[in-house]
């Protein structure tokens, strides 16, 4: 009897330079999310079909072109789906914050070798994560992880998620968890103030949900602030020269230990909930897709306009996350106004900035009550 195994592979060129990321010679803006392969009730034990579904959600529903496997290599079925869909994968070594003793480091180094051997035939894999996420500098250890991975795969660059400015850069790309945004001012730090070597590639490996969690049952105003937070950092990472792209934190809510999260062992950091139901923040990503058919149009309104849910029964800020050129507001059959994205506003660098609805009346008071709209 003959055992047989088929392995798919592909060819493409990858380059990180000071000016950004290039795939097959074309500049590509990385727009992705981090992914925990954790699910409600089942944990990590979901079958291949559900692992593949996450790749489809990222690519088709959310319009992402990249994903970071935080903080460990993930299901082969997920990587297979990323290959098929054309979803770039930043694969990361296992670990979180802690670096142990010599025996621990030897095992971590072996984990790195196994990660490369298991994943290197996947053309979707474009970047190796060789630092333990959130850890401090350790020159001797991280020299070994870089060398081990480059020895097994000299074709792909290495990176590692740094949590402080100007940490030691042994990798090919400086990846930075940028949680600097607090709702005003620049939404991400200046690249030149973070990386110790501006000649190398630079990307934002995390931002967003950890700074501003939102439960799916939070009120509209809270969910809107989270969505606008994601939009602001996405915008500023695109606008800043030399940033290869960003990975928002994160795809979906996930279970955690009691010391981290909201006290119920759940982190509500995702743009989707544990069951993969989208929150408003998911529309920030989905609305950046280029519509090629009417079915590709995304239209998500931040408010249901249910007066009983609004403080004082008064509508507050209302935004539409859409990739349409404009939206029209009607009150019943009466036309109120047409609204378009502000191409000079806070989100001007986005392909499709969210649209603010700031007039709910138009000329209706004049029409029905004889009142001057002015």
Where are the model-predicted features located?
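Secreted/periplasmic carbohydrate-active enzymes, especially glycoside hydrolases
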Residues: 1-89, 111, 126-127, 145-151, ...
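An acidic-aromatic loop/edge-strand motif
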Residues: 3-13, 17, 250, 267, ...
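Substrate-binding/catalytic cleft of secreted carbohydrate-active enzymes
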Residues: 54-60, 66-281, 294-309, 316-318, ...
């Amino acid at each position: 009897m003959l055992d047989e195994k088929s392995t798919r592979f592909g060819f493409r060129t990858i380059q990180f330079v000071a000016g950004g990321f290039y795939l097959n010679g074309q500049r590509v803006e990385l727009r992705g999310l981090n992914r925990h392969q954790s699910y409600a009730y089942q944990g990590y034990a979901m079958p291949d079909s559900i692992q593949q579904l996450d790749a489809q959600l990222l690519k088709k529903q959310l319009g992402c072109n990249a994903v970071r496997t935080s903080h460990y290599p993930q299901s082969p079925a997920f990587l297979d789906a990323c290959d098929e869909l054309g979803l770039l994968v930043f694969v990361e070594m296992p670990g979180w914050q802690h670096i142990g003793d010599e025996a621990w480091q030897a095992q971590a180094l072996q984990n790195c070798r196994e990660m490369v051997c298991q994943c290197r035939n996947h053309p979707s894999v474009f970047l190796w994560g060789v630092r333990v996420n959130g850890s401090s500098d350790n020159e001797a250890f991280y020299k070994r992880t870089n060398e081990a991975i480059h020895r097994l795969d000299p074709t792909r660059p290495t990176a590692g998620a740094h949590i402080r400015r100007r940490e030691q850069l042994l990798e090919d790309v400086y990846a930075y968890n940028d949680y600097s945004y607090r709702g005003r001012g620049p939404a991400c730090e200046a690249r030149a103030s973070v990386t110790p070597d501006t000649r190398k590639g630079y990307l934002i490996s995390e931002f967003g949900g950890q700074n501003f969690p939102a439960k799916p049952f939070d009120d509209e105003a809270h969910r809107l602030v989270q969505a606008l937070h994601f939009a602001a950092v996405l915008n500023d990472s695109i606008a800043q020269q030399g940033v290869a792209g960003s990975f928002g934190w994160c795809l979906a809510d996930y279970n955690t230990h009691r010391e981290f999260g909201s006290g119920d062992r759940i982190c509500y950091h995702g743009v989707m909930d544990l069951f993969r139901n989208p929150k408003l923040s998911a529309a920030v990503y989905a609305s950046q897709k280029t519509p090629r058919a009417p079915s590709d149009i995304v239209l998500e309104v931040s408010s249901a306009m249910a007066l009983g849910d609004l403080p004082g029964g008064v509508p507050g800020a209302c935004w539409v996350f859409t990739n349409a050129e404009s939206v029209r507001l009607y009150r019943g059959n009466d036309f109120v106004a047409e609204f378009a994205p502000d191409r000079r506003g806070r989100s001007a660098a986005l392909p499709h900035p969210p649209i603010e609805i700031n007039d709910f009346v138009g000329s209706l008071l004049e029409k029905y009550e004889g009142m001057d709209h002015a």
